[in-house]
């Protein structure tokens, strides 16, 4: 996924409206009785998009949701392991899931055949529902007359101290992915310098609201979350894909070991990987599909993936060293909100 070296700054453009014609519905597994309990760290737009497809394509498949941060929900699943309450967890990066893999059921969904092998766990413990790019969400009205940054290095300018917000990496896989990537790209000294400018929020959703409402000049987040503000017409909001490279990470869904809903849980899992669900996610929540049979440009105006320089990170290493990294991060004493 290497691309050319270029900095992208997305301003408001015309966002395509309406759903494109969907392909004929796949033969989803037949549902039995029992409500599927979905633990999800995703935003309302993403969850509603998937539930809308479920209602249309599988009206007898009932799904209830419990929301929270990815780390919080995974620890809840761990605490419930003796008597599972969740059927599916959606979603987190592999660098976070690796520490909890004993809680997941191996399941080779028929729908996963449309995904590249790299987006499926080799033992089918998790499957990518979509792919994220890391961006800086910028509110130009809060830059104090300074030009918008173009690089990661620009973000360590002391003038931006206290003006950049990020979620807590202990509770947010988004924040962990971002900070791990910065550490690998800029080194420990670069990460420490960036940390001096950051304010940490306990909730990932606060990052978006704080920038959107002008409380902070910048927020470090995933492309899909920030682009919703561009698509919504906030002309002061733009997205930065840093020139040195940004990070790409798949977002995964898992089947919880001992899922109470049984066959229904697998039916919901299959539906979440369907072409219909991924198109709905793309058009309503701006999440790049994991399937290889969807042309992003036909649905939303996001930069082509091969036009963005992507800095590769080792997800297995990130998972193995997660606790060690978080201890080092906490030693920086970053400001909190």
Question: Which residue stretches match the model-derived regions?
Answer:
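A ligand-binding cleft/hinge motif common to bilobed small-molecule-binding domains
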Residues: 95-99, 217-236
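N-terminal secretory signal peptides and thylakoid transit peptides that target proteins
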Residues: 4-22
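Periplasmic-binding protein-like
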Residues: 118, 132, 192-194, 200-201, ...
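Mature extracytoplasmic/periplasmic domains
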Residues: 256-313
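Short, polar/charged alpha-helical segment
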Residues: 37-62, 229
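Short beta-strand->loop
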Residues: 104-113, 126-127, 153, 230-231, ...
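Extracytoplasmic ligand-binding site segments that recognize negatively charged/polar headgroups
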Residues: 41-48, 68-71, 85-216
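A bilobed periplasmic-binding-protein/Venus flytrap-type ligand-binding module shared by bacterial periplasmic
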Residues: 137-142, 180, 249-262, 280-281
């Amino acid at each position: 996924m290497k691309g050319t070296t270029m900095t992208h700054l997305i301003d408001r453009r015309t966002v395509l409206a309406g759903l494109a014609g969907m392909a004929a519905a796949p033969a989803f597994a037949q549902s039995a009785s029992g409500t599927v309990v979905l633990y999800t760290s995703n935003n309302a737009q993403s969850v509603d998009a998937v539930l809308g497809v479920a209602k249309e394509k599988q009206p007898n498949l009932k799904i209830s949701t419990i929301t929270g941060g990815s780390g919080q929900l995974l620890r809840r699943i761990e605490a419930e392991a003796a008597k599972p309450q969740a059927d599916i967890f959606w979603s987190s990066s592999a660098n976070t899931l690796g520490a909890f893999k004993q809680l997941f059921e191996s399941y080779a969904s028929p729908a996963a055949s449309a995904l590249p092998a790299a987006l499926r766990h080799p033992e089918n413990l998790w499957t990518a529902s979509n792919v994220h790019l890391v961006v800086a969400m910028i509110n130009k009205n809060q830059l104090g007359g300074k030009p918008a940054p173009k690089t990661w290095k620009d973000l360590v300018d002391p003038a931006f101290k206290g003006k950049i917000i990020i979620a807590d990496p202990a509770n947010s896989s988004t924040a962990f992915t971002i900070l791990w990537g910065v550490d690998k790209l800029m080194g420990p000294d670069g990460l420490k310098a960036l940390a001096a400018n950051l304010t940490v929020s306990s909730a990932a959703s606060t990052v978006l609201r704080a920038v959107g409402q002008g409380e902070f000049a910048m927020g470090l987040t995933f492309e899909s979350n920030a682009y919703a503000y561009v698509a919504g017409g906030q002309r002061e909001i733009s997205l930065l894909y840093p020139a040195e490279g940004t990070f790409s990470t798949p977002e995964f869904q898992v089947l919880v070991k001992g899922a109470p809903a049984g066959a229904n849980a697998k039916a919901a899992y299959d539906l979440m990987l369907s072409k219909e669900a991924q198109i709905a996610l793309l058009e309503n929540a701006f999440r790049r599909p994991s399937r290889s049979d969807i042309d992003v440009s036909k649905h939303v105006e996001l930069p082509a993936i091969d036009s963005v320089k992507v800095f590769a990170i080792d997800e297995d290493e990130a998972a193995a060293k997660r606790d060690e990294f978080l201890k080092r991060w906490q030693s920086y004493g970053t400001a909190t909100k």
